[in-house]
Amino acid sequence: EWRHGISNFLGARIQKIYGNRYVPLVRPDGTVMNSVSDAAVHVGMRISKNESIYRMPFDKQYMGTKYPVLTLGFTAGIPRVLSGSCEYYRLEGGIHYKPELPPLGYSDITVQGGKIFGKVPYPLLKLHEGNGTYFYDPMAFSCMNFYEFASDTWVALFFEHHFNGILLGRIPLIKKLKWREVLVCKGVWGTLSKENDGSLAATQAPLLFPPGMTSVSDPYVEVGFGVENIFRLLRVDFIWRVTHRDPKPGQEIQNFAVNLGIKLKF
């Protein structure tokens, strides 16, 4: 952290990603790979203004700010470090903002985007975050399957509005429970270059996509509502898939999901 509100980070990784029967690693010629190798370095920056930070001996916790928080990241794949590791560049950015809108509560907004330069096997693409559990994840799509969509250029929106009981607080019996309502909307749009689109019949990509995985050039959108502050701890969300509601051949999807979350609120 160079100064208050501006921090940088630097990292490196070496990994092998193994295939399985659900997520096979198959070349266009039909041969099967055992694993995908990746070696990369990563640099990033986080910029905030007037943010409260709780500092611990070896870590710190960001407590929030009324201003937008900007994050930037750059990853470079290093070829020939491992057998099969490839050269690529990945640029990502995001903005997180929590505007107060009294007396209507507050919003929690995150916008993310990125671009991958180079030809990479699909495990190194942006694999958009599905949620295969019953637990709510604010940065994942509740009705999306794992490995359903991949992109090398993308932008995503995660939006919540917390009404702080402005509606439920008007109902006499529920008012005593202090339940609070939440509106949720999430969406993502992305594209794939021909050299990375493993869903094409005559693909130029290093690997074929698993069954059902495609680009998300038609935006994926899901919306829903939730109730939070149940026993001051629990949150229940009801989410509907708005687009991509028809399954592809051999694919199962869910158009409705119920998620449970745990968050202490005061």
Regions found by a protein language model. Give the residues of each.
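Exposed, low-structure sequence patches enriched in small/polar residues
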Residues: 1-266
